[in-house]
């Protein structure tokens, strides 16, 4: 009987409309995206980048830990030994279509060479443009170095 009375007096509709009316006069929470951008968390996992030392030398020591830990098998590394005996990468590819942005590659890297940066606007029309090679990753690192360094500094206590 009570359910009949509730449906007769349109109780559900009145309840829903009161909820709508409650939020109607509150300030809007949406933003006009291309023109306004919201705050990005320091722990945000975006576009990958390879970092360099202050001297300009790349940080990656070709230990291949990131390749081994990647659950999606999105990273391919080939390395050669230099004249001074140190190993460096000759090929460092990341297939961004396979990547699940878990951050395990960043956690596994002993020298903070591979990081996931603050950029989330890297859409592409072709599959080939989403396969990042070493040069593109180094360019990303050079472009985002200040943001990457501050991001790693903020997260240092929790690592």
Curated annotation (Swiss-Prot):
**Amino acids binding [4Fe-4S] cluster 2:** 70, 99, 102, 105
Lineage, top-rank taxon, reads Bacteria
Catalysed conversion reaction: a quinone + NADH + 5 H(+)(in) = a quinol + NAD(+) + 4 H(+)(out)
Determine if RNA-binding is one of this entry's keywords. no
Give GO terms for biological process: aerobic respiration
Cofactor comment text: Binds 2 [4Fe-4S] clusters per subunit.
> What is the enzyme's class at the highest EC level?
translocase
Q: Which Gene Ontology CC terms are recorded?
A: plasma membrane
Describe its membrane topology. Answer: Peripheral membrane protein
Q: Which cofactor does it need?
A: [4Fe-4S] cluster
Q: Which InterPro entries match?
A: 4Fe4S_Fe-S-bd (IPR017896), 4Fe4S_Fe_S_CS (IPR017900), NADH_quinone_OxRdtase_chainI (IPR010226)
Q: What is its EC number?
A: 7.1.1.-
- The entry's [4Fe-4S] cluster 1-binding residues are 60, 63, 66, 109
Q: Which GO terms describe its molecular function?
A: 4 iron, 4 sulfur cluster binding; iron ion binding; NADH:ubiquinone reductase (non-electrogenic) activity; quinone binding
Which positions fall inside the 4Fe-4S ferredoxin-type domain? 51-80, 90-119
Alphabetically ordered keywords of this record:
4Fe-4S, Cell inner membrane, Cell membrane, Iron, Iron-sulfur, Membrane, Metal-binding, NAD, Quinone, Repeat, Translocase, Ubiquinone
Protein's cellular compartments? Cell inner membrane
According to its UniProt record, where is this protein mainly located? membrane
Its assembly, as annotated, is: NDH-1 is composed of 14 different subunits. Subunits NuoA, H, J, K, L, M, N constitute the membrane sector of the complex.
Q: What family does this chain come from, according to its entry?
A: Belongs to the complex I 23 kDa subunit family.
- Quote the PANTHER family the UniProt record gives: NADH DEHYDROGENASE [UBIQUINONE] IRON-SULFUR PROTEIN 8, MITOCHONDRIAL, NADH DEHYDROGENASE UBIQUINONE IRON-SULFUR PROTEIN 8, MITOCHONDRIAL
The entry's function note states: NDH-1 shuttles electrons from NADH, via FMN and iron-sulfur (Fe-S) centers, to quinones in the respiratory chain. The immediate electron acceptor for the enzyme in this species is believed to be ubiquinone. Couples the redox reaction to proton translocation (for every two electrons transferred, four hydrogen ions are translocated across the cytoplasmic membrane), and thus conserves the redox energy in a proton gradient.
What is the protein's given name? NADH-quinone oxidoreductase subunit I
The record lists the organism as Rickettsia akari (strain Hartford)
- This chain is encoded by the gene named nuoI
